[in-house]
Amino acid sequence: MAYQAKHKHARISATKVRPLANLIRGQEVDEALAILKYQPHRGARMLEKVLKSARANAEDRGAPNLGGLRVVEARVDGGPMFKRLRPRARGMAHVIKKKFSHIIVSVE
């Protein structure tokens, strides 16, 4: 049975977190946590928290083998955007997009 954890509306762009999710997909949970611990990215901290939450969900729901849990799904989807205007020369304005993402991790 798969145990899942989600972080909706994470305040980071999905393109920054997706490569980290690709690193841990298919790994055992302890190994994936070790990989994320030594990544120098802010998204690694977020992904690490979601992975720990998925492991805690498995423990809480009575998973039979906690030592052999594997990451079966690590998905990062795009979320909503805040749009801000940055004043530019000659009365113009450029749109600055503050991107959000949804981080989903399943272990089995």
Regions found by a protein language model. Give the residues of each.
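Structured, basic alpha/beta domains of bacterial-type, RNA-associated proteins
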Residues: 1-23, 27-108
